[in-house]
Curated annotation (Swiss-Prot):
Similarity comment: family membership: Belongs to the thiamine-phosphate synthase family.
Name of the protein: Thiamine-phosphate synthase
EC number: 2.5.1.3
Pathway: Cofactor biosynthesis; thiamine diphosphate biosynthesis; thiamine phosphate from 4-amino-2-methyl-5-diphosphomethylpyrimidine and 4-methyl-5-(2-phosphoethyl)-thiazole: step 1/1
A biological process from GO: thiamine biosynthetic process
Pfam family, one: TMP-TENI
Primary enzyme class: transferase
Entry binding sites for 4-amino-2-methyl-5-(diphosphooxymethyl)pyrimidine: Q36, Y37, R38, D39, K40, N68, T106, K136
One Gene Ontology cellular component annotation held by this UniProt entry: cytoplasm
Length: 209
C-alpha cells in the first residue's frame, strides 16, 4: 500500500475506559491510513487482545496496523513495527518480520539517523517533534529546513510527528511530508464522532487541490 496520509497513533491514557476501539474505528472511518498501537505497559495479555482487535479494524478499513516497540508482537500478528532509537535493532526486526513488513524508525531531528535507518531496511522514517508535544515534551526539536534537506536525499516516505494540528499540517505536507502522525489533535476528543470529523479534515489535506 502507498504510505501517504493520516497516521493515527494511540495513547493508552487518552484512550482508556473503553474508548480505544470506538475512537480508533472513528479515525479509520475518517481516512487514517496507518494506525500505530502504542502501549508501553507490561500487561502482555491485554496488549495482545487489543492489538488483535485493532488489526481486525484496520483490515476492515483497508489500513495498516503498526505496533510500537514490540517486534515479537508484530511478528505474531503479521503487522508492521515502529522502532525508536532505543527500541532495538532495525536490521534484526527486518530479518524477523520479512521483506514485506512495514517497519518505521524514529529519527528525531537528525538526517544521519534517517540515512542509517534506510540502510538497515526501514520502510519509512519519522522526524520530530516539529511543535510542542505533550506526548514527548523533551524530544529534540525538528525544523522544516530538515525536511528540505531530507526530501531529495531520502527515497522513501517521510513521517512528521510532534504537536501537529490541522493548522500546522499543511505546511509540513507542502515540504514533502508523506504522513502526518497525530495523537492528541485526533484523539483528545469528547466523542467518536469528533474523532471522525478530525480524521476527515486531516485526510482531506492530502487530496489534490
Amino acid at each position: 500500500m502507498k504510505l501517504r496520509g493520516l497516521y493515527a497513533i494511540t495513547d493508552s491514557q487518552l484512550l482508556d475506559d473503553g474508548r480505544l476501539l470506538p475512537y480508533v474505528e472513528a479515525a479509520l472511518r475518517g481516512g487514517a491510513r496507518l494506525l500505530q498501537y502504542r502501549d508501553k505497559s507490561s500487561d502482555q495479555a491485554r496488549r495482545l487482545r487489543e492489538a488483535e482487535s485493532l488489526r481486525e479494524l484496520c483490515e476492515r478499513y483497508g489500513a495498516q496496523l503498526i505496533v510500537n516497540d514490540d517486534a515479537e508482537l508484530a511478528a505474531r500478528l503479521g503487522v508492521g513495527l515502529h522502532l525508536g532509537q532505543t527500541d532495538g535493532s532495525l536490521s534484526a526486526a527486518r530479518a524477523l518480520l520479512g521483506r514485506q513488513a512495514i517497519i518505521g524508525a524514529t529519527c528525531h531531528a537528525r538526517l544521519e539517523l534517517a540515512e542509517q535507518a534506510v540502510a538497515e531496511g526501514a520502510s519509512y522514517v519519522a522526524f520530530g517533534r516539529f511543535f510542542n508535544s505533550s506526548t514527548k515534551p523533551g524530544a529534540p526539536a525538528a525544523s522544516v529546513e530538515l525536511l528540505d534537506q531530507a526530501r531529495p536525499r531520502l527515497h522513501l516516505p517521510i513521517t512528521a510527528i510532534g504537536g501537529i494540528s490541522l493548522d500546522t499540517a499543511p505546511g509540513l505536507i507542502a515540504r514533502g511530508v508523506d504522513l502526518v502522525a497525530v495523537i492528541h489533535a485526533l484523539f483528545a476528543a469528547a466523542s467518536a464522532a469528533e474523532v471522525e470529523r478530525r480524521a476527515r479534515a486531516f485526510s482531506a489535506l492530502f487530496e489534490p487541490a
